[in-house]
């Protein structure tokens, strides 16, 4: 199974430690290819969004089913999210702090109405990926 996470920005040491804890757990089921896009320094927000979106689109692996993590996306329970992980070649996208041009992304997922810091959200995403694999493999983790 191929899983990709494309995210704008890099994790600080503290968040990277948390991310790696779950990445190690996920590694029993799949390898996650993490692609970090450098945040664009641009005072014009609209132009910044366009540039970051272009960089993201260039990094999406061929034939990958893409899910953009968005406040306007579909809300789902952990079991439904777990069912997505039965497919191969998935890419999850976490845009920059100003978002992306959403018109390029048909599949959108929303984990919450709350807004999270992007670094924390990356940890939340990989935890949910692990939770999904635990559900699919009947591992006692999800309650």
From Swiss-Prot:
One GO MF term attached to the UniProt entry: rRNA (pseudouridine-N3-)-methyltransferase activity
Binding site for S-adenosyl-L-methionine: 95, 111-116
Catalysis: reaction(s): pseudouridine(1915) in 23S rRNA + S-adenosyl-L-methionine = N(3)-methylpseudouridine(1915) in 23S rRNA + S-adenosyl-L-homocysteine + H(+)
Main subcellular localisation: cytoplasm
Highest taxon in the source lineage: Bacteria
Keywords on record: Cytoplasm, Methyltransferase, rRNA processing, S-adenosyl-L-methionine, Transferase
GO cellular component: cytoplasm
EC id: 2.1.1.177
Compartments it resides in: Cytoplasm
Claim: Cytoplasm is one of the keywords in the record: yes
Subunit and interaction comment: Homodimer.
Protein name: Ribosomal RNA large subunit methyltransferase H
Gene behind this protein: rlmH
């Amino acid at each position: 199974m191929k899983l990709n996470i494309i995210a704008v920005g890099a994790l600080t040491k503290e968040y990277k430690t948390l991310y790696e804890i779950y990445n190690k757990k996920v590694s029993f089921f799949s390898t996650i290819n993490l692609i970090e896009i450098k945040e664009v320094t641009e005072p014009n927000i609209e132009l910044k969004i366009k540039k970051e979106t272009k960089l993201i689109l260039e990094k999406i692996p061929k034939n990958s089913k893409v899910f953009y993590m968005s406040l306007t996306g579909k809300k789902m329970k952990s079991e439904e999210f777990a069912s997505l992980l039965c497919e191969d070649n998935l890419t999850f996208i976490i845009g920059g702090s100003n978002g992306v041009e959403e018109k390029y992304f048909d599949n959108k997922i929303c984990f919450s109405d709350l807004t999270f810091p992007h670094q924390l959200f990356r940890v939340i995403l990989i935890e949910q990926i692990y939770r999904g694999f635990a559900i699919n493999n009947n591992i006692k983790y999800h309650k």
